Amino acid sequence: MTAEQTSRRALPRHYAVSMLYEHLGARPRIHDTAVIAPTAVVSGDVEIGAGCQVLHGAVITAEGGPITLGTHVIVMENALVRATAANAVRIGDHTLVGTLASIAGATVGEEVFLASGARVFNGAIVGARSEVRVNAIVQRRARVPEGTVVPIGWVAVGDPLQLFSPDRDAEIAAAQPDLDFPGHVFGVDRDTPDLMVQLTERYGSSLARHADDLPLGDARG
């Protein structure tokens, strides 16, 4: 029996056919009672707790930093959860991540509702029992207190938190003058004359490490 066949047999039936990958030497750790859809991708240093549901098309990828899902977390269709070396992800118990929502390098508390299309960016913290409604954005390093509602399409910025409607672009920028997106997320100086050349080459080099990922499951069973 090959090592690949052995690894497949070691996986419980309810996620043995999912797309699971070892990345940078780390493998997903999935509770026996969690259910991962066959077309979901789980890659790298990811821990998924009891009773979690990860639906079709969802991607949970630990790219240098860990991802931890508590118990009874639901990740809906085509949602994205991504950690980086600089920003881990933690999602608390009984939280729902809606269809097409994304969490990048952020901490989300327990019993949080992230509606369809919601975005939570690097370094942000969303407190327990909060709601980030349809297409709303929690910006980098924002701190959303417990029980906060971020309205549909609005933008949450800063610590202490400020909430802005999307038409107030100048105020949103003014509320976060020290946030350096290229530097914080990609390690590239914003003022460099070839910013996008450096950004795409550096980030592409990091992403290229997925070429060495080891498949742990077969979507065909």
Question: What are the roles of these predicted feature ranges?
Answer:
Residues T71-V73, G92-T95:
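Short, conserved structural micro-motifs that define repeat-unit consensus positions
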Residues I30, A34-G70, I74-A83:
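A positional/architectural concept
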